[in-house]
Amino acid sequence: MRKKTTRYSLKIFLSLTLFLAVVVVMAMVTVRTRARPQWQQKVDDWVLEEAGAADEVEFLVVLKDQADLGRISDRLSKAEKGAAVYNSLTDVALRSQASLIPDLKAAGADYRPFWISNMIWVRGDRTLVESLAGRPDVAHIAANPVVKLDLLPEQATAYSSAQDSAVEWNIALVQAPNVWAEGIDGSGVVIGGQDTGYDWQHPALMNQYRGWDGQSASHTYNWYDAIHEDNPNTPPGNPCGFDSPQPCDDQGHGTHTMGTMVGQDGAENQIGMAPGAQWIACRNMEQGWGTPATYAECYQWFVAPYPQDGDPFSDGDPTKAPHVINNSWSCPAGEGCVDPEVL
């Protein structure tokens, strides 16, 4: 009888201990949350740390008002759906950003508004971060770190090497030639790629570039450069420059990936999976360094391409959007790419 009582008492003791531990942890979390000012609860820790260590920091101001695209009918054509998405996203962003942008101008901050997600890229100090986070129309101040992707050097050079056979081994392995024999080679499809850029004059890519008609090139609506300024982490003097008016690759990886998609020059360089498709592109990295903002800007351009010097809110043309998009890169959690409000 004493053994049963002892066991029963032990169970009660362990249960009470576990209960008290949970209560203590919850109390600590509550105290910690209450200890942080309300505006800080909207701000990513990375932004607070960087803003405290530097005069200025890049961040993304995500607004509460976001477009509801679920109301757009699935029965619409691609062109109709593209127009509906573009109009809905731009309308919400223009309306809700109207009262915030004057404050950014008054603060002398650099900024770039987006509509793909209702947010604004901003470069400013901690005072501005606090001011923006305190606004009721702001949902979140997200991080925008500059991170170098692990792009293998051999990937950048393998594409330019001489090939021994007309059809590359990887293309043959998936039996793509058998599909081509059925008349399916990507014809009528436009592929969008975002990466380190693209060498549009490469012999295996030039004829598939939508901006090339065989005699002259038109890069408007077919190419966009989301790299607008030098990255402090890279050597000065980018070989492509910034806001490049034509496709350019400052690292080589992007050209390699496009070759895998559509590459063929009619001779030995039959290395693409869909050689009949056309391609358009956006540069989202400077020599392998990218940010959530540059990735989002390329996605925005793909939804409704616009000229390099155009206004994304009024000059976008959804009819020129690609049918599919290829991303041969990763965006880890440490780069701020786990936030569904941003990407």
Language-model segments: what does each one mean?
Residues M1-S9:
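N-terminal secretory signal peptides that target proteins for export/translocation
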